[in-house]
Amino acid sequence: LDSFIDIRRSYAHVYEKEFSNIEGIILPKTIDEVKHARHLFPIILDTDKLTINRNEFMEAMKKENIGTGIHFPSLIGTHYYSKTYNYKEENFPNATFVGERIVSIPLYPKMSVEDLRNVVDAVKKIINYYRKKWSTGLVH
């Protein structure tokens, strides 16, 4: 078990290094004093800076032969919470923001280094392709 955790941590470190300066991705925060098992590697898509939403990103990843998942949906908008407690998504903007944008990318101990590189390359390719191109505001 410890060796699997070490591998996942190592791969998570690669993701953090590769994606840390990519505009359009928000990475999970880590605390140095906490020994995280890195069971999953979720990223948040900053859709204000992209021309695609999470579902379109997931479809683009699928076309690159890379699976993704939604492991942390917001519970605020579910039938139970809306009916039982009268919760409305607009009253929980942070949960709604994350719930609509979070996606898990592959992270498992049997991944090869080539698999890891393929995930990194695919994420960068898709994010770079769909990043909003900011205009200068000048009229041509």
Predicted regions span which residues?
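PLP-dependent aminotransferase class I/II
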Residues: 1-140
